[in-house]
């Protein structure tokens, strides 16, 4: 526990530093989750797999297929969604590289088996692993591979709609309290993405943190 006694008597001489690091990591995870939820809930185009019309009508026959991805790509084309994303790279995140002729799709790690087992309309393997095309393009962090017009990025902490699908009957799918879990795929057509790091940009600090030790008091004058 984070107490004055633990700071004074714990065998870990760097306990305060470790505590601050874990608090920062937790704050970042909360921020990332909130951003994911906001992006998913405000998507301009929403498509459900199979014949479902919302989360609650998804059943065990509605597992993601190549046809679902093809129909999603057509919907995005009809809505004029671009196929060009810019990533910002470099030590100080100032270099830009364009990812052409594709859309970036973010998925949870739970969807990896579904993607790698996917076949196209001719019963041929649809999934192309990233190492097959990495030499000819810029690979994104966490990129797993490609299917059709989509390049899939695995996000280990991707949000899910736990227990918001139909009834789970076979036990072969993720579920919560007997109801199927729904795993969203977030597709991005353009705009820039970067990583948030602790390094300065050379001109200013990115942020400041203030930690109050257990024996220090908060107040309106000292928030």
Regions from the language model: what does each represent?
Residues 55-89, 110-223:
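Sequence/fold signature of self-assembling virion shell proteins
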Residues 1-2, 21-22, 223:
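Oligomerization/assembly interface segments of phage tail-like spikes and tubes
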Residues 6-89:
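Alpha-helical scaffold segments that mediate packing/assembly in large oligomeric complexes
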Residues 1-14, 88-117:
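Structured, hydrophobic secondary-structure cores that serve as assembly/anchoring elements
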């Amino acid at each position: 526990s984070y107490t004055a006694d633990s700071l004074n008597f714990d065998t870990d001489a760097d306990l305060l530093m470790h505590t601050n690091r874990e608090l920062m990591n937790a704050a970042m995870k909360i921020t990332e989750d909130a951003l994911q939820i906001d992006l998913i809930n405000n998507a301009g185009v929403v498509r459900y797999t199979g014949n479902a019309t919302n989360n609650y009508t998804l059943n065990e026959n509605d597992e993601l297929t190549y046809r679902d991805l093809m129909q999603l790509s057509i919907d995005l084309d009809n809505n004029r969604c671009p196929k060009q994303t810019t990533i910002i790279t470099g030590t100080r995140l100032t270099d830009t590289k364009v990812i052409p002729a594709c859309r970036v799709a973010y998925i949870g790690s739970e969807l990896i088996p579904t993607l790698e087992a996917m076949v196209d309309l001719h019963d041929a393997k649809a999934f192309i692993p990233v190492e097959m095309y990495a030499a000819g393009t810029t690979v994104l962090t966490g990129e797993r591979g490609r299917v059709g017009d989509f390049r899939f990025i695995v996000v280990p902490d991707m949000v899910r709609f736990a227990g918001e699908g139909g009834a789970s009957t076979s036990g072969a799918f993720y579920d919560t309290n007997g109801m199927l879990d729904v795993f969203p795929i977030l597709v991005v057509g353009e705009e820039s993405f970067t990583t948030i790091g602790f390094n300065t940009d050379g001109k200013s600090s990115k942020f400041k943190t203030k930690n109050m030790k257990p024996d220090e008091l908060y107040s309106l004058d000292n928030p």
